[in-house]
Each structure stands twice: as structure tokens, then as C-alpha cells.
Amino acid sequence: MITLLIIMLLMSLFNMSKTPEAKGPVTYLQYSRSEMRYRVEYVFKRAENGDCTLTKIEGYQDETGQTIVVPASVADKLWEMVEEHKMRKYKSSYTPKMRVLDGYMWKLQAEFAKGERLYTGGDNEMPDGGIGIKQLVNYLAWLWDKQNVPPIREMVYRVDGMVAYPLHYYKLEKDYSNDCYIFTNASNCRYDEARSAQVPNAFADEIRQIVKEESMFDYAPDYQPEYEVLDGRSWRINLRFEGTKSTISSSGREAYPAGEGLRRIEQLCYEKWKELEPQSKPAPLQSPYE
């Protein structure tokens, strides 16, 4: 009995002497990547009162960057990714066997609620093929793009019904040579009967504003109705942006995302096309069903 008590006492002392395991949320996180002609850095901070900010520094001339306010839940989301990919076990340095002169360098450091810190970096090589770090960086970029909405590179909005042609089809694509956009309409006609016209950049900026106001970066990939509707409509929207991998890709049948984002874009495109139609030109499209 005495022996058992001694063992239990020793185990208790051993557990008390162990370093407390780090717990979320993340209170500070900095990621940077440098290449020959490009540099990007994200800095996340969580204040003692729980307020969170994200700063993006881009290019070699930018020293202070821009800062936005982000939800407090971001701190927990970052912690989840750190734990999921076991980032606290990353080595302090990763360097490939062969030197790459025109490659890249990266650095990641973070602090957690109980004071533990993470520091890691590398030269043209990342742990686990970079899966964890890329997921984390893509999330930070998505947060940034959600609030700032980069210039649109391409948009396709389509609504289909029970007929052989689209009820609505609007495509907006950047024309770099003329510093404008090509606006294509194939609504209520066959795809090979589509027409297009040039529109100024300001039109794309109006769509960007709708994307921001309606929080369209939060759109889920798929929306399905609670009950099947045999003669219902289906819709799809795809948006790509300049200088980022962030995209918006969403579709549904009858059910729509919260808000008025899709309807506002549809109405804006409809009104704009009424102005452009007299000057439009044939622009046959390939049917997505062929």
C-alpha cells in the first residue's frame, strides 16, 4: 500500500514538471516568401482583448503594407491548421541538396496562447511537400481577398432551365491589349449565336463591389433545394481574379446563397447589355454540353 502511494506521488510530481502543452488560439503569425522579383508577407496579430488584424506586405518597395480587421475565429482556424499538419514539429530550417539560384526563400513564425513559439524556414524546400504551409497561406490570401476583392480577370454567370439554350449567360473577360473587358452574352439563344462588345473597367469594378458587399467569397460550392423541383433552374458562377489563386466557384439548383449577390449581378449585366447590344458583334461560344 505504501509502495503504491509512493508511485502515485512520483507520477503526480512528474506530470506537474512537464511543460504545458501549447494550446490555441494563435496570437501571432508571420509568413514571408521572397523570390528574385517578388515578395509577399502576411502578419496576423491577436490583441489581448481578442481583436484580430491581418497585414499584407507585397513587393520589395512596400515596407508597412495594408492592415484589415478579421474575425476572432481566425485565430482558432490558424491553430487548427497548425495542429492538423503538426507544424510545431517542423525543423527550424529546410534546405535542398542542390542550390537553386533563381528559387525562393520562405519563413514562418508563430506564437500561441500559452507562450510557445514556432519558427521554421527554408530555401526552395518545404516540409511535407509544403501541403500544410500552402493551405495556411491560401487561407490568409482568401481572407485578404474577401475584404479587398482584387480586380476581376474573368467571370462567367449562367442560368439554365428546361430548354436547349441558357436562360442567362454572361461572360466578362479582361482584354489586356485594349485595357478594357470583353462582355459576351448568350442569353436566350444558342451558344453559337452569342454576341460580345467591349466595356470599360468601371463595369468590372461594379461587379467587384457587389462581390464585396454580398460577401460572395463565403459562397459554398454547391446549393441544393430541400425538395426536388423537376422544372427548376440551375445556376453557376465562376470568378477569377488578378494576382491571386483565390476564386469563387459556386452552383445550385433552385436554392440560392443568402443575400442578393447573384440577382444583383444578373440585373447589372442585363441592363448593361441593353446599352451594348446595338454595337455588339458575333462571338460564337462552344457549348459546355458538347
Show where each model-derived region lies.
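Charged, low-complexity intrinsically disordered regulatory segments in eukaryotic signaling
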Residues: L5, E35-R39
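Short, flexible N-terminal segments of the mature chain
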Residues: E41-E63, H168-D192
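Short, well-ordered, aromatic-rich surface patches in folded extracellular/luminal domains
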Residues: M16-M36, Q66-I68, M81, R88-A164, ...
